[in-house]
């Protein structure tokens, strides 16, 4: 099983690659919409990346409560345990 730090590193790399963000801006407390300016279309791309990484089907319900990078780490941990 991957640690939260390993998942955070993976998410950081994905966000930097997909959305040209600064790595230092991608912290567990960073809010996806407000701080990182990720919009609803970007979330679809992000869901696809999570699905690819976890091997689990990702639904909109999985992302309903995701507001921060830390929330995304928690979702990925849950999917990896499934």
What are these regions (language model features)?
Residues 1-24, 77-82:
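Thiotemplate assembly-line natural product biosynthesis machinery
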Residues 6, 31, 68-71:
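Residue-level recognition of oxygen-bearing side chains
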Residues 12, 29, 47:
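Generic structural marker for isolated residues within well-ordered, non-membrane alpha-helices
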Residues 24, 34, 61-64:
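Pre-signature/interface helix of ABC/ABC-like ATPase nucleotide-binding domains
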Residues 29-36:
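N-terminal helix-turn-helix DNA-binding core of bacterial DNA-binding proteins
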Residues 42:
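Two-component histidine kinase catalytic core, primarily the HATPase_c
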Residues 59-81:
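C-terminal structural segments of small proteins and small subunits
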């Amino acid at each position: 099983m991957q640690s939260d730090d390993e998942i955070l590193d993976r998410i950081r790399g994905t966000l930097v690659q997909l959305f040209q963000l600064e790595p230092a801006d991608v912290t567990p407390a960073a809010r996806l919409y407000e701080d990182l300016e990720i919009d609803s279309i970007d979330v679809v791309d992000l869901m696809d990346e999570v699905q690819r990484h976890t091997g689990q089907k990702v639904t909109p319900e999985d992302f309903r409560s995701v507001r921060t990078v830390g929330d995304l780490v928690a979702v990925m941990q849950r999917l990896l345990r499934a």
